[in-house]
Amino acid sequence: MKKIFITRKLIKESEDKATKTFDPIFNVNDELYSQSKVIEMSKGCDGILTSLTDRMDQETINKLPDTIKIISNFAVGFGNIDLEAAKKRSITVTNTPEVLSDATAEIGILLILGACRRAAEGIESAKEGGWKWSADYLIGKQLTGTRLGVLGMG
């Protein structure tokens, strides 16, 4: 069974799956480990499951044990990993592409609706106990009959 180091705490279902598939080393306290700690914890491992909070720069990658064959990034991108340094060490790097595409679109719609209906102002007013009715209080913009286009930028 392949041994992997998982740098950050995952949801229970993911940790259970990792336990069935691999011999995992978990970061049970979900601490943001230093680069030297990541190097130390990955000794004897075949792979590392990083998150976007882990800086895997050239110096860190160059110091990883020779047993490391893969860095899997628990993120959509690779901004935290020096891909060229990994390539020079023949370390495969993967990510989780498109896993957040639908969620990102949904949050975009949420933000549009919240802005049009002045949701943040309403929440703040309710928290402060300042909810004062009037015909035009926090009326916002009604979207019924509005044509809306959403363009992706990623």
Where are these regions (language model features)?
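An N-terminal-biased, well-structured beta-alpha scaffold segment characteristic
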Residues: 1-94
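Hydrophobic Val/Ile/Leu positions in short beta-strands of Rossmann-like dinucleotide-binding domains
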Residues: 6, 148-150
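Short, conserved catalytic or interaction motifs in soluble domains
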Residues: 76, 98, 150
